[in-house]
Amino acid sequence: MIANYQQPGAAIDYTNSTGDTIKAGQVVSLTTRIGIAGTEIPAAAVGSLHVKGVFTMDKASGAIALGAAVYYNASTDKITTASSSAVPAGWAIAAAKSEDTTVQVCIG
């Protein structure tokens, strides 16, 4: 097989099929991972979705250790360490205390 280089892969073109506008910075579930909207993406339009990088995201209660695998819970719109009913998001690049409201996540 021959593989042809396409792009660095830090962002992808994403067709918004949600029926609603996706806001810039909004987390988008890609079933087995997440992306972050780089710009506002109107319904049925194509826009940029970051799939690599470090992002500060809202987190659920509870401490998160440096290096912990983290997940996106769409029902709460928060990052958690609980994998049940959640989408893999990446890993925590810094520890977050239980009382912290955000965590730094490396996606991709």
Stretch-by-stretch model annotation:
Residues M1-G108:
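Surface-exposed, low-hydrophobicity beta-strand/loop segments enriched in small/polar/acidic residues
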